[in-house]
Each structure stands twice: as C-alpha cells, then as structure tokens.
C-alpha cells in the first residue's frame, strides 16, 4: 500500500493553509482540518515552518481551530519534530478549541516514512488535556513515555518501525477514555524492535476500559501477534480488530481460529495477508455467519529466490 496525505481528520476535511501570496477565501476555522506545511526544496519559498505556523495562527481564528495536520516541516534527515512539538506547546493558549492533531503528514514523494525524524511527542498531550485525537507518522527518533490523559479517544502511530519503548510507553499510559488505538509496528531494520512481550500489558486488558478498536498492524511477526491476540483478555471488549498489513500466514490464521471466539466483533481486517485459499475460506466460514465483516483484500506478494520465500510488510522504508 502507499502512504498518502490525510484527506480528513476528526471528521473534518483537510484544507491546506495557503502559501504566502495566495489569497483564497478561507473556510471558517472550525469547519476543516488545517494542514500546515512547508517545502524545504522550493527555492522560491521565503518562510520556514516556524514562520508559516505563526502566520497561520495570525490569519485564522486560532481559538476556533478544532483539527490540525502538521505536514512537512523541513528536510527529513536534518530536522526532527522537536521544534514542532515546542511550537504546538507554545500555542496552547491560542488553540483553545483544538481537539485533534496529526504530526507528520508526509508522503514518500517528500520523504520515506522511515526517514521522518520524530521526537518526544508527549508534551503535546500534556499541553492539551482536552485533546481527543492524536496521530503520528514516522518512528525514527520517536519517544512516547507513559502519560496520563483523561480525554484522548484516538491514538495512532503510522511507522515502518515502531520502537518497543514506544509500545511499552503506550501500554503503561493511563488513557481511560481511549476508544481507538492503532499501531503500525513495522520491521526491525527500520527500528521496529517491539516484541509480543511488549504488548502483554495492553493485551491483558484493564488498562484501557473504553477501548473498542485495536490495530496491531504492519508487523513482520504478525503470526506471533495473532497468536497473542487469540488468547488476550482485551479482545472481549473490542468491536473491531485490525491485524492487516503484516506478514500474516496460515499459522497466524490457525491461531485465531483456535483461540477465543471472535464472533462478537463487527469487523476484522486481515488484508495484505499470505493465506492459502482454503484458509481464507475457513476464516470466512467461521466468522461471517455471525455477522462479522472479514476483510481479506489485497493478498501480499511473495517472492522466491533460490528456493527461499520472502514475505514483506505493506510499509517499511
């Protein structure tokens, strides 16, 4: 799959804050998700991200902005998100209606996902205790120590390699309102060193009582994750489960079928899988009669080299 620009955030359509010299009619501040970005390779651009962000705050009714998408802020290798986090924290008294932030809306044409340099992003959550949705793209340099946040409902990490330290930080966090959690775990080559053991506190249940959707996706150990999920107490409280984008084979599917019932789910996403046709049918036969929507689209492409079979996650570099 390809990583694309966000088209919406928090139920609001994305709108690109215009560059200097452009004067389109702007929508009401609370009606769109504002995307603020700069192009470091545009020789005609005369402002960096800090200047662009200040211009944004001065141009729109900042106190009415509900959703903010942070796009490219500089050259990927040379600029992590630390300065962006500081800008967001400094603006907390102006962005008093902010409910959703996505940090790193950067596509491969700008920088590969593994090139996006992040930082400790939790100061944003601490600065905005009323925030409801927070998403991050890029795992390099990403830090997420355990936090307490009473109102966050959606938390997502899109990476080609999510550090185990981040997974442990999420699992140790106090997020009583969290309903939706999505983590692209990625591959070890790009920093995705999380293990099933790192997921254990999360899967044990009790930490996030409001959680209704769990996505543990894009992993090269997707079979092991499926086996852990199959026995996880947390699953009983879920309405939907996403194990897509990873190297999920018949072994992982067999673990799901042999584990606890999944017939209470509204849907389960297993796309980008490596199932045999017979296993795919077994999954459908086990779940669809109970009304579970089963997504088995986009089978992964195997490659064979000198008798060895290679399987890949959907997103890595």
Stretch-by-stretch model annotation:
Residues 1-82, 88, 92-95, 313-317:
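N-terminal alpha-helical scaffold/docking segments in eukaryotic complex subunits
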Residues 16-22, 48-57, 79-92, 112-123, ...:
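Leucine-rich repeat
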Residues 32-44, 69-76, 102-114, 130, ...:
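Concave beta-strand-loop units of leucine-rich repeat
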Residues 87-88, 95, 100-105:
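Amphipathic protein-protein interaction modules
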Residues 122-132:
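A broadly conserved amphipathic alpha-helix scaffold signal in soluble, globular proteins
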């Amino acid at each position: 799959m390809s990583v694309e620009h966000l088209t919406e955030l928090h139920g609001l359509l994305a709108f690109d804050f215009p560059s200097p010299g452009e004067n389109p009619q702007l929508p009401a501040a609370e009606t769109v998700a504002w995307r603020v970005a700069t192009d470091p390779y545009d020789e005609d651009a005369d402002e960096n991200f800090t200047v662009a962000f200040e211009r944004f705050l001065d141009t729109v009714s900042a106190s009415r902005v509900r959703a903010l998408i942070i796009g490219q802020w500089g050259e990927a290798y040379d600029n992590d998100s630390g300065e962006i986090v500081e800008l967001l924290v400094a603006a907390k008294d102006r962005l008093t209606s902010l409910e959703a932030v996505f940090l790193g809306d950067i596509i491969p044409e700008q920088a590969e996902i593994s090139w996006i340099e992040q930082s400790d992003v939790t100061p944003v959550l601490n600065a905005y205790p009323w925030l409801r949705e927070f998403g991050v793209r890029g795992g390099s340099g990403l830090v997420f120590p355990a936090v307490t946040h009473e109102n966050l409902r959606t938390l997502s990490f899109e990476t080609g390699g999510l550090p185990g330290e981040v997974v442990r930080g999420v699992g140790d966090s106090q997020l009583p309102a969290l309903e939706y959690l999505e983590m692209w775990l990625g591959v070890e080559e790009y920093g995705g060193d999380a293990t099933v053991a790192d997921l254990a506190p999360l899967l044990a249940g009790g930490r996030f009582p409001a959680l209704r959707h769990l996505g543990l996706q894009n992993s090269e150990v997707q079979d092991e994750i499926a086996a852990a999920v199959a026995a996880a107490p947390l699953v009983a409280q879920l309405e939907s489960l996403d194990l897509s984008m990873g190297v999920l084979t018949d072994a992982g599917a067999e673990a799901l079928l042999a584990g606890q019932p999944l017939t209470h789910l509204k849907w389960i996403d297993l796309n980008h899988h490596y199932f045999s046709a017979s296993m795919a049918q077994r999954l459908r036969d086990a779940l669809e009669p109970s009304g579970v929507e089963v997504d088995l689209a986009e089978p992964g492409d195997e490659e064979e080299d000198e008798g060895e079979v290679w399987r890949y996650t959907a997103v890595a570099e």
